[in-house]
């Protein structure tokens, strides 16, 4: 797992950021910050009392994979925004669009199926 995070590993975050990132964007202490920000966003999206990070051990493997994908791309969103000038504008915007679309899909899934998702995860 990422040194400071629970829902995604450093490797997953770096993969989501992609090639061409600058040294600060792939620095471990920065990816630690971005995963914590992503986890905070996800906790807020689920609402109080769910405790994604606190109850991580009880979540099923399939949902852990889903959460890792969302968390790593949300963290990548912060990393890419840290210095979007690492890429040509079109590339940076494309990367941000992918991350943002995954986040919007996650929020939409929660809006429509939150109770079912929480129950299926065993929370």
Short names for language-model regions:
Residues 1-64, 108-123:
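Conserved short "hinge" loops at termini or chain/domain junctions
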Residues 59-63, 67, 87-90:
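Short acidic, glycine/proline-enriched loop segments that cap or flank alpha-helices
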Residues 64-76:
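Core structural elements
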Residues 2-4, 73-123:
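Short loop/turn elements at secondary-structure junctions
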